[in-house]
């Protein structure tokens, strides 16, 4: 059968001998050749039909080879005949196109076959599915690359043939495949042949609009707030960079703006500059600790930061330093930069993310081109940090490049002067010689002969050190008040011959065992931060190792507790992140368990105190780990002592309340992957579990996620309810996020019957009075089955007798500390029930409070902090709740004991413990004046544990936090007045709060709904807490000057002008840019890890504290950019927009929802409803365009602010976009411009939403189709101006984000759209052309005219094919038909372009000038027709 096809071809190509002989005189009939060609085509169809299906590809290949060898006329006939095979369904159009393009003879040198091949493809490609068209287009694109750049004019027709088929495919009106696919393919292999470059680039340029709709305005200028918490993956999606290129990771190939495709070096450098940023850097770049991979981009930025620090140092004089135990060293910003860089360098080199050797080489290369000398010692100091700690474990070859830095940085021919040994700057100046000594020692150990001489500049330094380590000098050395011993430790930390003696002296000084020259005992000395900063990392590690070793020995021997100076110094050492493995990690994993194992209760108590009151910026996972450890330790019988148990609970309370809102959910869910949910919840303490739930509620509210309950959270809550069943009052549930509210509403425990409780207490009291035998009394009340009502009974005894009998003492001693908590809960319930039901009123409640105060202060039965915490967390409704709060007020304020202690403690003490050397002396004197007892009789069985860092005031502080919150929840005026009284007397205690601004932020955020209508209470809260620091902080440390004036005024109302909001945003923007707007502080001991974080939280506190409605505050913040655009320096505009986004995203929903209100206003502007601008929508929505061309800016500026807000939002807040789009913005949309504006709003965040909330993207996509249908119907018969851009965006969503998830929903809507939209979107639903045409005729006959005017060539071909039977076609008719179709296609394109002006790739300002655009299009069409006619004439002459 295969030979039949070839025979048919040969028969057609055979030339009769007579014809050949008389060719010059024979006259042929007019239609002979056409009839012959028709017969051949029919015979070919018959012959091919007889070929087996599996052999047709091979036969077709042979046919094409035979055709390629024919003459010009015969090639045309042979190729044209192949169309018949496709029309007759003998072969598929896809197979034909593939075989033609793969034909070995297809070469542009073979002109006729090349041209006819591409003409053939053009004729049949309309019958190829879009995937096949995509592959054909790629092959055609690649074939064009065969032509040389300096192509000969004789090859131009062949190149034009390729261009013609590509133009045909690219023509959107033909709808052969989604234009999105075309752009995706042609963007990758640039550049193209110059003849096609215009075609390709013009098509790609059309997708600038799609790229604009999915690009964040000012993305490259956005900067984050770097907090120290453990980052969850979804919190970093906004800031992720490719770790090799430092570029943003965009989905899809689109022509984004150049700045979005550049390396984001400023972003990484900014983050690296921030203290406590290493975790964010690791998440940004997706650094994997276990892979030990070197990241060149990170390495380069570290080098740049070091060079920048040297430049900063060059512009400033060298620091003089501070004395040995200076309490408050003034460190300049650039010196902080060096301290921070040292920590960063060690971390990234330690985990092998960067190479130390390559960093040194890069530094040498950069510094060799610069004249920087002032910072050379600082550079050597940070190199010394790493060298001293790692040189013993690494070969000397890794450090040899450092010698090149010596040659470069120390070229002096005279020795440098020795620095002042009494100043801390001395250790920096001596760092070069310390580095030299470490390197030379390592070389000797490895037997490497380094002949390099000592730099002359360092000769004096070397001689001085050599003198210090002589035997005589070492033996007579004492610590003194200079830095010589520190220097020896730094220089010889790897040389045990010289290192042991100075390290021993440091330990002796801390332990108080040092001797003066005359033999006297020297008191223990706490090392200042200045001294610790002067030690290298290796020396710090050795020191902390010595501390831990000593404490472990003391724990094993149950000996004395370490000296206070040593513990204070140990706590200060734990703040250094570069020694984390030996520091906080060793503290939790080694020291604490060993101390507990050896039952060294005094040391355990002291270590927990130290953790509570001395440690800062402890990573969250360590705090969760300690919380779990505390719960496991507290369940051991040996720890069931009053003072130790109180310390456990107090430490756990501080741990729980200190967990940040953004930290709680990711850290706990991660922790529960390995541990049971009960690991961080208490099995016995209802109060701790209640605070844990309140902290979870706050986290859900502030950070988001309160609308749905995650799996780990349900397990966590059910575990709590199982071990400590409890209920919540309605006023607390009202503040809970919806998910928590629903959970506790369903799982609420029934309240205890108060009458039964009172009856049980009366029975116990009768039992007490009726029994006379002491042993019987003790046995009865210590029996496990007895109700835990002894504190209730004791209350009645003291009420009656004002004394406690010895029997009661013995019973209390028999009740364990944890069991006493159960008694306390019953007592609190009983107390409230008694007062609430009493008819005696004021006298009764006062006597009750006096009795409780006696129990607390006189008889030491319970402590004030435990009683108040328990009372505050009990579940009471209505009148009982008010009674409970009244009791709390009287407990705190009626008696003077607590108030006196608070006033005395706050007057004589300063919370900046790291600046003090005499904290212990002051604290000891306070305890002597106000001694604390933790038992009725501190006998031998209850030996008091030493107290170094805590007291009743500090323990009460987290309880006061809880009390304030509980008072706010009960929205009754007199309750809030009581809170005001409490703050008046006790707010001074907030001076010692380690997170006062964070506490204010959380309070104002969580209770925003309640406080919104209570400006006086907000003012009271902010004023009371911030004023507590008035004596120890500079005036500008927190709130702004105008707000401070408001706090000091009597009026509770104030409506600030726009300039006020502008100043707040300027302050934040300046801080982020690096200006020192606030006070200088040591961020290692601060509430916040860096200045921008501090600036954000104080700004939010101030805005939340304003007596202004949230929508008005939000509107003013947006107007800072919209109305203040003209007065903001243009170089700073993006930093201001970034700052507004940061602030709004950090405020509660009533504030950040204001951006949706403003977007709604934009959609409803008259010009959106009736576009009258002469600029098209994409121009006016482009921030860069309106800024540079000075056009109407409102739309673009509001978009920029919205993008900034959404970019800084967390995942849960961003996911609310679907709801706001549906409820607030969708009802406004009627026009194309509104639809495009809406696409600009959510388009840039689809990628993030897909990562964080995958199902949400599908919901947004369905909304978009619904809005498109509304717009389509609203426009009626009028053509859509932006149809192609909208379709491109829909294809982007389908192929990048949703796939076929919404296929059914989208298909139903697309079928209801106008035919032109259906045509363009048919690849989303796979609609047939017949369905599109037929459905629309049935649907709306009025659209027939539009359909006929805008019908595409593909539709025309499809409709004409049935009208002309293939058996009657002649060759001439085919040519005429083809020409007619081309002319019709040109006319249709011209008509369609007139009807719907394309906005893609049009000049600025052309959007409104339709007449001018039509003239341009007509001229372009005339030129195209002329070129096609010229090409046709050339082809005819050639043939």
UniProtKB/Swiss-Prot annotation:
The protein's name in its UniProt record: Mediator of RNA polymerase II transcription subunit 23
Region: Disordered, residue numbers: 1338-1372, 1401-1439
Organism: Drosophila melanogaster (Fruit fly)
Example of a GO biological process term: regulation of transcription by RNA polymerase II
Chain positions covered by the region annotation Interaction with Hsf: 358-625
Name of the gene this protein is made from: MED23
InterPro entries (alphabetical): Mediator_Med23
A GO molecular-function annotation: transcription coregulator activity
Domain of life, per lineage: Eukaryota
Keyword Nucleotidyltransferase: no
Biased composition (Low complexity): 1348-1372, 1411-1439
Subunit: Component of the Mediator complex. Interacts with Hsf.
């Amino acid at each position: 059968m295969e030979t039949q096809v070839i025979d048919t071809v040969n028969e057609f190509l055979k030339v009769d001998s007579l014809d050949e002989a008389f060719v010059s005189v024979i006259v042929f009939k007019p239609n002979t050749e056409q009839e012959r060609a028709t017969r051949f085509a029919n015979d070919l169809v018959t012959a091919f039909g007889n070929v087996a299906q599996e052999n047709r590809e091979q036969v077709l290949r042979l046919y094409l080879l035979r055709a390629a060898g024919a003459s010009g006329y015969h090639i045309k006939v042979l190729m044209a005949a192949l169309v018949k095979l496709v029309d007759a369904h003998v072969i598929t159009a896809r197979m034909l196109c593939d075989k033609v393009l793969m034909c070995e003879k297809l070469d542009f040198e073979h002109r006729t076959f090349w041209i006819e091949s591409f003409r053939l493809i053009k004729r049949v490609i309309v019958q190829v599915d879009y995937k096949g068209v995509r592959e054909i287009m790629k092959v055609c694109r690649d074939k064009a690359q065969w032509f040389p750049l300096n192509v000969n004019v004789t090859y131009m027709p062949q190149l034009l043939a390729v261009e013609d088929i590509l133009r045909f495919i690219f023509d959107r009106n033909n709808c052969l495949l989604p234009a999105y696919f075309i752009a995706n393919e042609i963007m990758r292999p640039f550049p193209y042949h110059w003849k096609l470059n215009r075609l390709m680039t013009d098509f790609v340029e059309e997708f600038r609009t799609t790229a604009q709709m999915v690009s964040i305005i000012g993305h490259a200028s956005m900067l984050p707030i770097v907090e120290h918490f453990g980052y969850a993956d979804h919190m970093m999606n906004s800031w992720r960079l490719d770790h090799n290129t430092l570029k943003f990771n965009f989905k899809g190939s689109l022509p984004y703006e150049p700045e979005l495709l550049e390396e984001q070096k400023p972003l990484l450098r900014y983050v690296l500059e921030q203290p406590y940023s290493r975790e964010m850097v690791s998440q940004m770049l997706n650094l994997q600790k276990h892979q030990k991979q070197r990241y060149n981009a990170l390495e380069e930025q570290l080098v740049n930061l070091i060079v920048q620090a040297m430049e900063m140092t060059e512009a400033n004089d060298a620091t003089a330093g501070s004395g040995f135990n200076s309490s408050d060293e003034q460190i300049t910003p650039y010196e902080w930069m060096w301290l921070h860089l040292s920590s960063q360098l060690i971390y990234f080199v330690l985990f092998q993310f960067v190479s130390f050797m390559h960093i040194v080489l890069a530094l040498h290369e950069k510094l060799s081109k610069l004249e920087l000398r002032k910072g050379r010692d600082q550079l050597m100091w940070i190199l010394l940090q790493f060298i001293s700690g790692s040189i013993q474990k690494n070969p000397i070859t890794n450090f040899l490049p450092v010698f090149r830095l010596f040659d470069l940085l120390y070229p002096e021919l005279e020795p440098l002067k020795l620095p002042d040994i009494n100043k801390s700057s001395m250790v920096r100046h001596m760092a070069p010689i310390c580095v030299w000594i470490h390197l030379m020692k390592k070389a000797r150990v490895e037997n490497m002969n380094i002949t390099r001489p000592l730099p002359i500049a360092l000769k004096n330094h070397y001689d001085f050190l050599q003198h210090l380590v002589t035997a005589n000098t070492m033996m007579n050395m004492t610590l003194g008040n200079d830095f010589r011993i520190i220097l020896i430790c730094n220089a010889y930390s790897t040389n045990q011959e010289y290192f042991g003696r100075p390290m021993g002296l440091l330990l002796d000084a801390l332990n108080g065992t040092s001797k003066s020259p005359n033999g006297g005992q020297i008191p223990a000395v706490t090392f200042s931060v200045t001294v610790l900063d002067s030690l290298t990392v290796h020396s710090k590690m050795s020191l902390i190792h010595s501390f831990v070793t000593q404490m472990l020995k003391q724990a094993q021997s149950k000996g004395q507790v370490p000296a206070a100076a040593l513990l204070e110094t140990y706590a200060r050492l734990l703040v250094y992140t570069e020694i984390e493995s030996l520091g906080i990690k060793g503290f939790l994993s080694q020291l604490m368990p060993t101390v507990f194992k050896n039952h060294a209760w005094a040391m355990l108590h002291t270590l927990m105190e130290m953790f509570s009151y001395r440690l800062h910026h402890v990573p969250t996972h360590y705090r969760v780990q300690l919380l779990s450890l505390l719960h496991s330790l507290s369940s051991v019988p040996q720890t069931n002592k009053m003072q130790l148990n109180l310390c456990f609970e107090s430490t756990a309370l501080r741990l729980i309340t200190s967990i940040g809102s953004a930290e709680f959910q990711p850290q706990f869910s991660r922790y529960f992957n390995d541990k049971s949910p009960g690991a961080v919840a208490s099995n016995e303490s209802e109060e701790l579990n209640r605070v844990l739930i309140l902290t979870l509620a706050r986290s859900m509210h502030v950070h988001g996620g309160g609308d749905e309950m995650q799996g780990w959270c349900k397990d966590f809550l059910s575990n709590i309810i199982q071990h400590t069943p409890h209920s919540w009052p309605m006023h607390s549930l009202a503040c809970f996020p919806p998910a928590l509210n629903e959970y506790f509403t369903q799982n609420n425990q029934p309240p205890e019957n108060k009458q039964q409780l009172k009856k049980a207490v009366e029975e116990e009291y009768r039992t007490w009075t009726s029994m006379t035998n002491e042993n019987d009394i003790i046995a009865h009340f210590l029996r496990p089955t007895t109700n835990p009502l002894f504190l209730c009974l004791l209350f009645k005894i003291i009420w009656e007798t004002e004394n406690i009998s010895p029997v009661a003492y013995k019973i209390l001693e028999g009740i364990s500390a944890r069991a006493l908590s159960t008694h306390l809960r019953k007592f609190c319930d009983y107390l409230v029930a008694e007062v609430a039901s009493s008819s005696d009123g004021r006298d009764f409640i006062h006597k009750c409070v006096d009795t409780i105060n006696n129990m607390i202060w006189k008889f030491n039965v319970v402590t004030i902090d435990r009683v108040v915490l328990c009372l505050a967390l009990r579940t009471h409704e209505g009148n009982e709740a008010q009674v409970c709060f009244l009791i709390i007020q009287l407990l705190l304020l009626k008696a003077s004991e607590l108030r006196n202690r608070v006033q005395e403690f706050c007057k004589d003490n300063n919370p900046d413990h790291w600046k003090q050397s005499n904290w212990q002396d002051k604290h000891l004197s306070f305890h002597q004046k106000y001694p604390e007892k933790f038992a009725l009789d501190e006998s031998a069985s209850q030996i008091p544990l030493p107290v170094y860092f805590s007291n009743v005031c500090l323990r009460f502080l987290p309880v006061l936090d809880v009390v304030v919150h509980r008072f706010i929840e009960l929205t009754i005026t007199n309750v809030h007045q009581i809170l005001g009284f409490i703050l008046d007397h006790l707010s001074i205690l907030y001076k010692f709060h380690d997170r006062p601004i964070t506490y204010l932020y959380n309070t104002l955020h969580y209770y925003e709904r309640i406080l919104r209508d209570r400006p006086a209470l907000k003012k009271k809260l902010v004023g009371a807490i911030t004023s507590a620091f008035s004596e120890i902080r500079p005036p500008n440390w927190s709130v702004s000057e105008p707000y401070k004036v408001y706090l000091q005024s009597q009026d509770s109302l104030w409506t600030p002008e726009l300039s006020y909001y502008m100043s707040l945003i300027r302050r934040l923007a300046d801080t982020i840019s690096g200006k020192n707007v606030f006070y200088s502080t040591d961020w290692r001991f601060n509430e916040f890890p860096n200045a921008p974080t501090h600036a954000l939280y104080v700004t939010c506190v101030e805005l939340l504290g304003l007596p202004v409605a949230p929508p008005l505050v939000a509107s003013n913040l947006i107007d800072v950019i919209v109305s203040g655009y003209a007065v903001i320096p243009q170089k700073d505009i993006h930093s201001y927009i970034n700052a507004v986004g940061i602030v709004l995203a950090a405020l509660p929903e009533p504030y950040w929802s204001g951006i949706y209100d403003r977007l709604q206003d934009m959609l409803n502007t008259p010009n959106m409803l009736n576009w009258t601008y002469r600029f098209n929508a994409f121009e006016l929505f482009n921030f860069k365009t309106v800024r540079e061309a000075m056009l109407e800016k409102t739309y673009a500026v509001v978009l920029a602010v919205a993008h900034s807000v959404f970019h800084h939002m967390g995942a849960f807040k961003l996911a609310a976009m679907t709801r706001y789009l549906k409820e607030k913005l969708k009802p406004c949309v009627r026009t194309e411009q509104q639809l495009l504006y809406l696409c600009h709003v959510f388009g840039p965040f689809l990628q993030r939403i897909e990562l964080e909330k995958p199902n949400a993207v599908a919901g947004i996509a369905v909304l978009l189709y619904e809005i498109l249908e509304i717009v389509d119907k609203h426009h009626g018969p009028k053509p859509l101006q932006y149809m192609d851009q909208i379709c491109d965006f829909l294809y982007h969503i389908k192929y990048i984000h949703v796939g076929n998830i919404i296929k059914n929903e989208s298909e139903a809507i697309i079928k209801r759209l106008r035919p032109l939209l259906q045509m363009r979107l048919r690849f989303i639903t796979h609609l047939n052309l017949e369905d599109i045409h037929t459905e629309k005729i049935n649907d709306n006959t009025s659209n027939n005219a539009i359909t006929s005017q805008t019908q595409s060539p593909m539709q025309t071909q499809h409709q004409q094919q049935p009208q002309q039977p293939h058996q009657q076609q002649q060759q001439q008719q085919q040519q005429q038909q083809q020409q007619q179709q081309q002319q019709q296609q040109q006319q249709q394109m011209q008509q369609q372009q007139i009807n719907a002006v394309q906005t893609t790739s049009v000049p600025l300002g052309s959007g409104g000038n339709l007449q001018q655009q039509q003239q341009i299009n007509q001229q372009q069409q005339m030129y195209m027709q002329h070129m096609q006619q010229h090409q046709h004439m050339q082809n005819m002459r050639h043939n």
